[in-house]
Amino acid sequence: MKLDDFDFDLPDGLIATRPARPRSSARLLVADGPETHDLTVADLPSMLRRGDRLVLNDTRVIPARLTGTRTRMSAQGEVTARIEVTLMEPQADGTWSALAKPMRKLKAGEKIIFSNALQADVHAMDEGLRLAFNVEGDDFDAALNAAGAMPLPPYIAGKRAPDARDYHDYQTIWAKRAGAVAAPTASLHFDEHLMDALTSRGVDVTFVTLHVGAGTFLPVTVDDVTTHKMHAEWGEVRATAAAEINATKAAGGRIIPVGTTALRLIESAAQDGTIHPFEGTTDIFIYPGYRWQITDALMTNFHLPKSTLLMLVSALMGKDRMDAVYAHAIANQYRFFSYGDASLLFPSQKGQTSR
């Protein structure tokens, strides 16, 4: 299975840099087995049945992009450098793994000043940058919220800088557990009106947590995709969530994760149609040939060429079907990636229909 098999040409103008307003007015491409329907996210309830269960990721994106200064003494006196930092994930010893630009201007033991309230010591660099901050807990959260910016994906950040609108736009309406440095973007389409409509339809929801890491944007660099090593992310399926999902399966309802993050987590926690409580890291890599455990359908945005997420949806729907879905999306001017439109995928090989 070759990486080039998952390539496609995407016009640059189809990369969304702002979300639809209102959220649920985004377009929704429904691939129901061999059938294709062009709808909007507001139509989602009509495509679901009473007793279906949506699985939602309640992670909260932290403002992980920081700009600070590093000062050191030289023969010419005090020298200051501007440093841009993106936090990756917290470590067991209290430090944060991070990326920095320019990395060459940092040495272990130096200090980066981000604001009067927030600074960090360069703790280590031999196996990647580690930062030790001067505050923790609620004080760290407050200082980070004041000094940080939302960590927009590179395909958006390359076109514009993050601004105040992104603090709202790049966060789900139910975001609760802080720790992600990227949003579960399919969930960005949900607003209160849509949630009310789903409740009226008799569609159930369950919340799980997967803290999306910056590794989600890393490219696949191997030609044989089956040899790719996925990044690890921390997630939790609580006992109540597992019980809700199992009850839906037992009653004949469908389990429909919203977003690939929720899907990867529940597949990690499931075996032979039953999901179990789970807490820890997962590096599950889903590509064509994968044996599905718990997922019946998926709502997700449109993904990058050659990405692991495109491989995931190809595993669910079949590669030829996904090639046709993406060709339809491009021909009909759907907007792609994090702030773009959505798809609702019902695989025909499982004998499912949308109603």
Swiss-Prot record:
GO terms for cellular component: cytoplasm. One of its GO terms (molecular function) is S-adenosylmethionine:tRNA ribosyltransferase-isomerase activity. It is an enzyme of class 2 (transferase). Its main location: cytoplasm. Keywords: Cytoplasm, Queuosine biosynthesis, S-adenosyl-L-methionine, Transferase. It holds the Pfam family Queuosine_synth. It is found in: Cytoplasm. One of its GO terms (biological process) is queuosine biosynthetic process. It catalyses: 7-aminomethyl-7-carbaguanosine(34) in tRNA + S-adenosyl-L-methionine = epoxyqueuosine(34) in tRNA + adenine + L-methionine + 2 H(+). Transfers and isomerizes the ribose moiety from AdoMet to the 7-aminomethyl group of 7-deazaguanine (preQ1-tRNA) to give epoxyqueuosine (oQ-tRNA). Monomer. Belongs to the QueA family. This is S-adenosylmethionine:tRNA ribosyltransferase-isomerase. It comes from Jannaschia sp. (strain CCS1). The lineage of its organism: Bacteria, Pseudomonadati, Pseudomonadota, Alphaproteobacteria, Rhodobacterales. The gene is queA.
